């Protein structure tokens, strides 16, 4: 007995412990069920209302206390409000904990209600209940509810995902078990076909009873829309509102309403992007999300692991974003790539001749030539075929080891003859001196594509004597400008090289309607609007000859990891999470619980079939398909790229075998193709099946013939994606089979595993067309997959460590921004800013005159102490004294501002208030004019105090947004520059953490300085009014009393950036919605030149007040 088995025998294994914890809950549900089953239809719905009331009342005292504190906040001095808000925050947290206890108490009854409702819908075509207002509202838009008199009739069939669906599901005991796991904030791993979607109805219903909102997160919009339509009626029957954010435009009222629903479905990206958009909003009306309460993530491994490498980014235009060099430098790169192709072919030809020689030296030269050909173009098909021959790859790897010895000391000898060097594993392309010479050509500047040693040049300049400071500064600027230009040129060349050598059309991307669109490697779907980052997308656009889009700058960013960690409670479900249980616990503190299957799995999983070449493999795949079709079985063929799908489709067409293709180019037909995939003799080719096969149902004839047959044409980098493909067969105890066809030329095998298997095949003397099938081989492939998974986990963990630094900063900035936006805590924040500024003025200035100047520049005040006091008093005391005077000045100025604005506000509101909603007030700080928009009614009722609040809010939002945008750019530059620290044996992450603190402190100081300076100087510009000016004062700019326009987000684009490669995959989703420009309109009617003058003089306007117009 091993040590682990010994421990398990004492403490029990993980599954046993989970069962012990969850099973008592299932027993409680089963005990409560008979009482619920006795209720009539109206009684069942009334029970739901009873539970809602019980949960609401459980925290009624705490809610009343929080409301009381909020109501009295205006009577509390600004300096003392922080303590009150801290109390409110504490009570809010207590309410959430009380709700959790109440939910646990009602869980058995709530789960019983859902189960009984599902049972009644499955047994009755119609359910009759007493109509409520909610029923009547639904009946106007939904065809599964109709009203007859005082009765509402609910049907048990409706449209879901484009298909008519009849409800025929009731929860099994194992699904109740899964529901408890999800409610407890854990991950439920359930085999495919065990009804994950139905399981989710239990915790979703229960947690929606609080009214705080439940988010159901899916991997794509098809599933989000389908699940909201499929499960929605079950929730709606009990008066719970359901919506899907993907049905509505971003930043719209409809999307805001979707978030206010009790249950909100949507895709992970859209939830994340909405959060970022909310933190760019300029009015509370622009916000769509409410608090992050509870989320259930479907395909949780795909969302929290696969997508976690890709930060969400909202970017906007940058100055001179159109000035790019991609089209200009493309011909040079094409010449470079063509020259490299000729060279790679020449070396491969040499290698083939020399390797077969009897002379040992010639054989060594042959393998060196082969290694050079591999470094030149590793994806060359002729090279890949030659490497699959007996002993060839092993010989090349030995040669590589020789040149890699002593930290790549001799590697340059092997790579110098090439124009550039490709490293597939590191996703990198490096230009050699020979390559630089080729593209420089006859240029006057031989260093056109060579980056200068800027540090050495600046050091030389500093030590240069005989130059004035001004001359040194001029030379320094010239050096830095030259470096920036060359850096951009070299970067563009590198990105173009990557585009030409490492990214293939119809594999990583497709070109549709003159646009380059990325294909998701996990799902095979087009990632609409996403873009690769760092100029790579523009490079591919230049390569494909389509329009090169303008460059962009990051305005807001977050990783999905940090977004989902904001939820009060998070849980998830998937068919394949156990292999990633460690990562899910490390990063999210989510425990994986494996749910037992309702019926034993009857699928037969066969060992991998390994061939030497892709050609042999695909031939064998077609033959296997032909045999299965003849046996009357449906076949699902999983591929890893669009290109392979199309090639197999052509091969099947030549054999006259009917089939359907499901990939990035044909995803519109998805629902139809998936629905037919279980019919006898049907062949379906699908590019990656993650979250796709949920609808493959089998007929009795198909089950008798052996069920659905799964054929994988290649092993994926992740074992989980392979398990998802296998899991499409053998649902609910159905028969089925799965097998993977692998060749030594596949990317995974080529990069990580094939040398060992190739040597086995060589020793056993395998000929072309023969295949090897053994458990040992399948295990070897699995080890290669583990290697890749570990590497990817490292990347994700590293990304998270970098983003954690930014996340702390983002939390502080977004909290401060939300305070400004909502206005509730803005006064408290401004008081703190003024205090910080006063303390900094005393702390940072050793000289009295400098301190005086600092106070004058930022706080617009004289120093309230003498030079002697400055030298002798304690700094704390001086800061307190300065703060008291600054606050007195600030209050006096804001009161004066309100006094000046009030007569105008009063006049406009009393004369034309019924016509207009907002008014624009011009305020200046002496440097620039700010037009402050303010609600007219609120300004009138508060005697213009609302004008002051709007001024504070507008300035703070403006300063925070500009400073944060600049900080993001600096952090981005810092992340790239610290990577060089590894050459000095330092940890780049550590340097990044230290430097980012300095950047953040500088940003906070800048926000404080700018905000306080503008607020302290802010005033409405007034002068002694002339008759004309008095007339103009009456023409105040106001907004019409129509519904206020929402913020225009159309100039921003959303991106997901894949950090698998430092440059890689930023993607961008353009919100193409046309937004109406928010133009203020005039309060008065426009007076024509020949109309009577409005002053009442009786003269024409052109001869009276219009004389000077």
From Swiss-Prot:
It comes from the Bacteria. Residues 1045-1059, 1071-1088 have a biased composition (Basic and acidic residues). SUPFAM superfamilies: Helical scaffold and wing domains of SecA, P-loop containing nucleoside triphosphate hydrolases, Pre-protein crosslinking domain of SecA. Monomer and homodimer. Part of the essential Sec protein translocation apparatus which comprises SecA, SecYEG and auxiliary proteins SecDF. Other proteins may also be involved. GO terms for cellular component: cell envelope Sec protein transport complex; cytosol; plasma membrane. Keywords: ATP-binding, Cell inner membrane, Cell membrane, Cytoplasm, Membrane, Metal-binding, Nucleotide-binding, Protein transport, Translocase, Translocation, Transport, Zinc. Zn(2+) binds at residues 1093, 1095, 1104-1105. Its EC number is 7.4.2.8. It is found in: Cell inner membrane; Cytoplasm. This is Protein translocase subunit SecA.
């Amino acid at each position: 007995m091993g040590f682990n088995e010994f421990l398990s025998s004492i403490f029990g294994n993980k599954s046993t412990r989970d069962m012990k914890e969850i099973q008592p809950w299932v027993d409680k549900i089963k005990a409560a069920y008979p009482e619920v089953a006795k209720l009539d239809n109206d009684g069942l719905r009334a029970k739901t209302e009873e539970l809602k009331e019980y949960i609401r009342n459980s925290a009624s005292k705490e809610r009343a206390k929080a409301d009381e504190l909020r109501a009295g906040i205006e009577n509390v001095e600004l300096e003392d409000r922080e303590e009150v808000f801290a109390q409110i925050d504490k009570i809010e947290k207590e309410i959430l904990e009380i709700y959790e206890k109440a939910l646990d108490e009602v869980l058995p009854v709530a789960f019983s209600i859902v189960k009984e409702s599902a049972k009644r819908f499955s047994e009755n075509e119609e359910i009759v209940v007493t109509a409520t207002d909610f029923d009547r509202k639904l009946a106007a838009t939904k065809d599964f509810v109709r009203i007859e008199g005082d009765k509402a009739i609910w049907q048990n069939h409706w449209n879901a995902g484009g298909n008519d669906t009849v409800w025929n599901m009731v929860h099994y005991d194992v699904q109740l078990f899964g529901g408890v796991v999800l409610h407890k904030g854990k991950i439920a791993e359930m085999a495919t076909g065990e009804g994950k979607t139905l399981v989710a109805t239990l915790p979703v219903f229960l947690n929606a009873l609080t009214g705080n909102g439940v988010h159901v997160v899916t991997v794509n919009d098809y599933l989000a829309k389908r699940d909201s339509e499929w499960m929605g009626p079950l929730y709606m029957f009990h008066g719970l509102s359901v919506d899907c954010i993907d049905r509505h435009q971003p930043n719209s009222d409809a999307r805001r309403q979707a978030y206010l629903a009790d249950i909100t479905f949507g895709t992970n990206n859209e939830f994340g992007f909405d959060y970022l958009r909310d933190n760019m909003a300029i009015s509370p009306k622009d916000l769509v999300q409410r608090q992050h309460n509870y989320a259930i993530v479907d395909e949780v491994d795909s969302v929290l692991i696969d997508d976690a490498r890709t930060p969400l980014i909202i970017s906007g235009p940058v100055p001179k974003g159109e000035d790019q060099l991609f089209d200009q430098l493309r011909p040079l790169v094409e010449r470079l790539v063509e020259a490299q192709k000729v060279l790679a072919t020449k070396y491969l030809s040499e290698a083939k001749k020399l390797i077969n020689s009897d002379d040992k030296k010639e054989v060594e030269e042959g393998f060196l030539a082969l290694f050079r050909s591999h470094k030149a173009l590793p994806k060359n098909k002729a090279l890949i075929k030659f490497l699959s021959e007996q002993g060839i790859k092993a010989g090349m790897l030995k040669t590589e080891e020789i040149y890699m010895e002593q930290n790549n000391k001799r590697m340059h000898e092997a790579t110098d003859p090439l124009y550039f060097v490709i490293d597939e594993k590191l996703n990198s392309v490096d230009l050699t001196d020979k390559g630089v010479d080729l593209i420089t050509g006859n240029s006057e500047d031989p260093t056109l594509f060579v980056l200068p040693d800027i540090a050495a040049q600046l050091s030389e300049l500093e030590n240069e004597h005989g130059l004035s400071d001004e001359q040194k500064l001029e030379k320094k600027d010239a050096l830095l400008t030259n470096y920036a230009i060359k850096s951009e040129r070299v970067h563009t060349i590198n990105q173009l090289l990557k585009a030409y050598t490492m990214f293939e059309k119809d594999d990583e991307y497709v070109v549709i309607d003159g646009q380059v669109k990325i294909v998701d490697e996990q799902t095979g779907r087009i990632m609409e609007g996403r873009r690769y980052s760092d100029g790579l997308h523009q490079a591919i656009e230049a390569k494909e000859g389509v329009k090169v889009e303008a460059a962009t700058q990051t305005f807001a960013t977050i990783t999905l990891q940090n977004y989902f960690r904001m939820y009060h409670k998070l849980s998830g479900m998937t068919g394949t999470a156990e292999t990633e249980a460690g990562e899910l616990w490390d990063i999210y503190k989510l425990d994986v619980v494996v749910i037992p299957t309702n019926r034993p799995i009857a699928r037969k999983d066969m060992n991998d079939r390994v061939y030497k070449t892709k050609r042999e493999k695909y031939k064998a795949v077609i033959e296997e398909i032909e045999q299965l079709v003849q046996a009357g079985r449906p076949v699902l063929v999983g591929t890893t790229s669009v290109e392979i799908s199309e090639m197999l489709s052509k091969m099947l067409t030549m054999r006259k075998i009917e089939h359907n293709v499901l990939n990035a180019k044909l995803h519109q037909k998805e629902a139809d193709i998936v629905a037919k995939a279980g019919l006898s003799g049907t062949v379906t080719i699908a590019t990656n099946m993650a979250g796709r096969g949920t609808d493959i149902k089998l007929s009795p004839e198909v089950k008798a013939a052996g069920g659905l047959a799964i054929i994988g044409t290649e092993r994926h980098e992740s074992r989980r994606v392979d398990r998802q493909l296998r899991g499409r067969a053998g649902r609910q105890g159905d028969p089925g089979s799965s097998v993977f066809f692998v060749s030594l030329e596949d990317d995974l095998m080529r990069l990580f595993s094939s040398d060992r298997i190739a040597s086995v095949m060589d020793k056993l003397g395998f000929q072309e067309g023969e295949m090897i099938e053994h458990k040992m081989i399948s295990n070897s492939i699995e080890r290669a997959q583990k290697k890749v998974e570990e590497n990817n986990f490292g990347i994700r963990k590293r990304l998270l460590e970098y983003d954690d630094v930014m996340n702390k900063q983002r939390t502080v900035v977004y909290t401060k921004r939300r305070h400004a936006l909502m206005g509730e805590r803005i006064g408290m924040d401004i008081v703190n800013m003024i205090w910080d500024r006063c303390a900094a003025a005393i702390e940072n200035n050793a000289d009295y005159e400098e301190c005086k100047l600092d106070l004058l520049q930022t706080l617009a005040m004289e120093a309230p102490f003498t030079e002697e006091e400055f030298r002798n008093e304690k700094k704390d005391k001086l800061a307190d004294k300065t703060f008291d005077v600054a606050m007195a000045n600030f209050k006096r100025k804001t009161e004066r501002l309100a006094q000046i604005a009030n007569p105008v506000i009063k006049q406009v509101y009393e004369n034309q208030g019924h016509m207009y909603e907002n008014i624009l007030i011009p305020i200046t700080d002496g440097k620039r004019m700010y037009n402050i928009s303010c609600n007219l009614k609120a300004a009138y009722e508060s005697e213009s105090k609302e004008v002051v609040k709007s001024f504070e809010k507008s300035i703070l939002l403006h300063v925070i947004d500009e400073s944060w945008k600049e900080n993001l750019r600096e952090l981005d530059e810092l992340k790239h520059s610290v990577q060089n620290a590894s050459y000095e044996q330092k940890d780049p992450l550590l340097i990044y953490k230290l430097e980012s603190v300095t950047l953040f402190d500088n940003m906070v100081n800048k926000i404080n300085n700018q905000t306080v300076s503008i607020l302290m100087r802010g005033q409405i510009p007034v002068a002694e009014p002339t008759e004309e000016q008095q007339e103009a004062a009456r023409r105040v700019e106001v907004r019409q009393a129509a519904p206020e326009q929402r913020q225009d987000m159309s100039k921003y684009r959303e991106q997901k950036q894949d950090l698998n490669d430092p440059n890689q995959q930023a993607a961008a989703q353009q919100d193409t919605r046309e937004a109406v420009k928010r133009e203020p309109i005039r309060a008065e009617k426009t007076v024509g030149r020949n109309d009577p003058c409005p002053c009442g003089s009786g003269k024409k306007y052109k001869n009276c007040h219009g004389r000077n117009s």
